[in-house]
Swiss-Prot record:
Protein induction: Expressed in the late phase of the viral replicative cycle.
InterPro entries: P-loop_NTPase
Superkingdom, natural source: Viruses
Protein's UniProt name: Uncharacterized protein B354L
Family of the protein in this entry: Belongs to the asfivirus B354L family.
Assigned keywords, A-Z: Late protein
């Protein structure tokens, strides 16, 4: 339901959809206890059917247990850091953490692109028995005609994706038919990884202190500017809009403000370079939006050209994020023992020397 300002301006309500967040960066701004984590979990629920992998970095998780029951403990990190076997105490652990994720996702992206090569999918389709092809040819022909007639690039990309998904669906449904066929290495590779979902959800919850040294690093900029190429959906929770530099703030696809004062501060800040019209609009609507549990959402590239919305989401009920295979692996390697960080200099004060 849309809200109306005193001057008659409308503020539409936004119903979150997966396309708002998949392969994009979302930033939530607001002090503690203003509902940021409620929104994160709501977004997780929306993305659950589309993304099978997740990593959470949440320094406050040991005390508040915000993600307990939603994300397996093995996928939650209390700090942005990855050890180096040669230099366990160096100060580049945060960079290594992000670089490891980026390298893995780059490989996942490469495999996914190879598997989804249309020429290879068509080759595999035409290796199916004739009766199966005759059954599916009508649907295939429809999509091929749509693709040939399309002149709009974005629509053509959507139809190409639809064509890929249709071919993959037919191949997967009949994958047993390939068992006794003579196949090339590329064909075997495609069949082996045809169900691969490369997408990863990365949540950085109140990690401002650890992120600050990374703002000028190329690896962190990649996560903001190139994450869609590696199928990374990123959610960052900040206490204040100044927790991120202006160039990164402006590149977030979705910005969610859980507090009126931080919202006003963000849009009035000179370095963010919002238009005078946007500043005046936010000043007018913020008095109306931030009541009860309502929040303000700003979408940078909005296909509806509205950009500003109000939103209210329900309290989340527990669910386990991740694929069955991921959760099975997590359970296999999980240890309930508390792991002590022995690189902490104070560890030497407590260890037992026999």
């Amino acid at each position: 339901m849309a809200l109306t300002t005193h001057s008659g301006k409308l503020i539409p309500e936004l119903q979150f959809k997966a396309h708002h967040f998949i392969d994009k960066t979302t930033v939530l701004y607001g002090p503690s206890k203003t509902g940021k984590t409620v929104y994160v979990k709501h977004i997780m629920k929306i993305l659950q059917p589309h993304i099978e992998q997740i990593l959470v970095v949440a320094p406050s998780e040991p005390s508040n247990r915000s993600y307990e029951g939603f994300v397996h403990p093995t996928l939650i990190h209390y700090r942005l850091w990855l050890a180096d076997k040669q230099k366990k105490n160096d100060n580049k652990g945060a960079e290594r953490f992000l670089e490891a994720i980026w390298q893995r996702q780059t490989m996942m992206s490469s495999i996914y692109s190879r598997v989804n090569n249309i020429d290879m999918l068509k080759t595999l389709y035409h290796k199916l028995p004739i009766d199966i092809q005759q059954k599916e040819n009508k649907n295939i022909a429809k999509v091929e005609c749509l693709k040939a007639e399309q002149t709009d690039q974005k629509k053509e990309e959507k139809i190409t994706s639809l064509y890929q998904q249709l071919l993959k669906k037919i191949i997967i449904q009949n994958i047993h038919m390939y068992k006794n066929l003579c196949l090339t290495e590329d064909e075997k590779f495609t069949l082996n990884y045809i169900n691969l979902n490369p997408r990863l959800l990365l949540i950085l919850d109140d990690c401002a202190a650890e992120l600050h040294p990374l703002f000028t690093k190329e690896i962190f900029k990649k996560f903001f500017y190139q994450n869609r190429h590696c199928f990374i959906s990123m959610i960052i929770c900040c206490q204040d809009d100044t927790d991120l530099p202006a160039n990164l703030r402006k590149n977030a696809f979705v910005s969610i403000f859980t507090n009126a004062s931080i919202c006003m501060s963000n849009f009035s800040r000179q370095s963010n370079r919002y238009s005078k019209q946007d500043k005046e609009y936010v000043e007018e609507i913020s008095h109306i939006v931030f009541k009860g549990y309502r929040k303000l959402v700003y979408i940078r590239e909005d296909e509806n050209r509205q950009h500003f919305y109000h939103s209210t989401v329900p309290l989340p009920t527990a669910f386990s994020f991740g694929s069955k295979a991921l959760l099975k692996l997590c359970k296999a390697v999980y240890s309930k023992e508390v792991v002590i960080d022995k690189s902490n200099p104070y560890w030497s004060k407590f260890r037992l020397n026999f």
